[in-house]
UniProtKB/Swiss-Prot annotation:
This is MICOS complex subunit MIC60. Residues 136-164 are annotated as: Disordered. Component of the mitochondrial contact site and cristae organizing system (MICOS) complex. It comes from Meyerozyma guilliermondii (strain ATCC 6260 / CBS 566 / DSM 6381 / JCM 1539 / NBRC 10279 / NRRL Y-324). Residues 63-528 are mitochondrial intermembrane.
Amino acid sequence: MLRARFSTSRSVLTKVVTPPPVVPPVLPPPVKPPKKSFSLPKFLFSATLIGSLAYGGTLYVATKNEKVMDYVIDYQPPFYEEILRMIETGSIDEIRDAWDSLRDRISNVDFSSSKSKIDKFANDLENRGEQLIQKTRQRWGQDTAPTPHEQLQKPVETTQKSPESLPLLSYKGINESVHATVASFNELIKSIDISGPGSNDLVKAIQDNVAKLSQKVDALTASFDDELKKNLKVSQNELLSSYTKKELELTENLLHQYNTERAQLEKKLNARLEQEIASAKEAISQAAVNAVTMVRIEQTKNFEKLVKDKVDGERSGRLANLDKLSSRLDELEQFAESLEQQIVANHNRSTINRSLAELRSLISSTEGTTPKSLAPYLGQLIEAVRPINDELIDATLKEIVPLLQHESSHSILSTSQLLARWELLSPELRSASLLPPNAGLLGHFTSFVFSKLLLPVKGAKPNGKDIESVIGRVEANLVRNELDLAVEEAASLKGWPRKLADDWVVEARKRLEAEFLLGLIEGEVRSL
């Protein structure tokens, strides 16, 4: 069809240029108009459109059906990953932007051709046609008819004819997205001058194809919008369910965290409450002592105020006795101060005596009681004697703290325990007293045998220096609770008996020193 247009245009131009013919050319017999030829562009456009729709529909179905998706993955058609990604994650705005970009590209295509290009293309077609006709005539022996070149050499009659143009396409009933394409076709039609019987049919066919294209675009857009709405609705439901599930999970996590934090806060609050209760008890006990002191001080102040008011009330009538009242008031003030000092001293003394009594009771405790450390009670004693500021008491505390700081109520032996250990130690002392100097195994054996033959002495011999007299005096002193004399007798031993009694002497001295130092503090406190 396009070749016919160019041939007709070329023939018209030829008629305008060539001179008038001398001999009229021999015209070929009339030929019947050919039937409507096959349109390759229309076929390609339809096939491309149908193939694209089928390909896109197959990939869209693959997103919904696993079997189709397996088929697509097995055969791997071209660009299937990109199209699937666009179907799953694309949006209407992206499709519209792509369509607008494609439409702009089509509208920017330059379909207009210059007249020189058309003439050149027509000359090429004419030359190829002449060559084809010559070859055909040579083959079939038909050389009688003049060739187109011969016809051109003959003068022809010159006629003036204005070029006709094809009718333009109409925009009526066409989708707006195809307007740019229609405009491009109209520009192409304007650039072509043609006169022939099939021009109107050609324009009508193009108009029908454009209308069908517009209808298909509308149908495709409507189906795409419907499918998009369905997908959006399904996605909305899925998102709503997922958000609801996440909300429930977050609520459970928050409740669990809340319960955990609540339990921890309750635990901390209970511990803090117990600590505050203990502090409050201690503060209340201290406040009770302070309250007694404050009441006495307040009574003294009230008495002073009463006296002052009495003096001020009777000053005008009894000025002669004012000096006596002033001296009496000074005496009362001194008495109040001395009374306050005595009260404080009595309180400190009672606190010190209580601490000393607790230490004595712990030192004298029996084995059946629970062992207790003496360090806290020593701390209470130090705090109690600190306000006194006495040098003797401070020196005594420096001696007693290293002695009893690491001891407990069971580590310091009582008098009965010392007596029991002395009785257990007595046989060994008797045996050791019979050992000669540098005794060997035989000496130890004989001393053990002869020690069994010794008869224990009943009663104490004040002047006896033998081992039996010493053992008897120690036992008698322990029975009379005279620990200092017992330690002195045990320390007077010599040789192996003194070595054997060394541990007993250390334990006895520890108790003796503790009792002596506590008694010294108690006596000093009483003398204050």
